[in-house]
Regions:
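Enzymes that bind and transform nitrogen-containing heteroaromatic metabolites
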Residues: 1-196
Length: 196
């Protein structure tokens, strides 16, 4: 079991554009749609394929912007919003958001939430979906074990940063998957600033 920040990023380090859109990701050939498990059992899929990651997830945590993006961009033709994942999910927010089946809202301290995520994961991984600042809050408390990045062959020029923290990582694995470069890192700890 590990707590893993797994996300896709542009070549220039953005996880969403300034409009909170991920259209750039889902229009890239091979981009995994939320809730997809298409390649999880595909023996020919790269080891670091998104769908293989999804298969090991036991619980999910994300921020309010993430669930609002999913609600806005994945709700089709006036259909009711359905959270695309079956795993127990928490949304860290201080806003009043509409209830969503299968999603619990949390406005407390990440240190208090983490044990609940681990228990719900039942020996599987905790997926920190994002955004980057939420992943940073887990890292600040020493609760983030790994960073799993799928770097997409696109340059956005602006947007939401991948992980707005100074962290030292150790690369475990590197793989390619179509138009993506997949990288798995262990979190070593904070990267100190030069005192000079």
């Amino acid at each position: 079991m590990a707590t893993i920040y797994c996300t896709a990023t542009s070549l220039d380090g953005y996880i969403a554009d300034d409009d909170e859109s991920l259209t750039w990701l889902f229009t890239t050939p091979g981009g995994a749609a939320p809730g997809s498990t298409a390649g999880a059992d595909d023996e020919s899929a790269p080891e670091l394929h998104f769908d293989r990651f999804f298969a090991g997830v036991g619980s999910i945590v994300c921020g309010a912007n993430t669930i609002e993006w999913v609600r806005r961009d994945l709700t089709k033709d006036g259909q009711p919003f359905v959270w695309p994942y079956s795993q127990p999910t928490w949304v860290v927010t201080h806003r009043d958001l509409d209830p969503v089946d299968g999603v619990e809202y949390f406005a407390g301290d990440i240190a208090d939430l983490h044990p609940r995520l681990v228990e719900a994961a039942a020996g599987r991984d905790v997926w920190v979906v994002g955004g980057g600042d939420l992943a940073g809050q887990f890292a600040d408390l020493g609760l983030l074990d790994r960073v799993w990045i799928h770097q997409c062959a696109v340059v956005l020029g602006y947007g939401r940063p991948l992980l707005p923290r100074r962290l030292r990582l150790h690369r475990r694995q590197l793989d390619t998957d179509g138009q993506f470069t997949a990288m798995l890192f262990d979190v070593v700890g904070p990267e100190p600033r030069d005192s000079a």
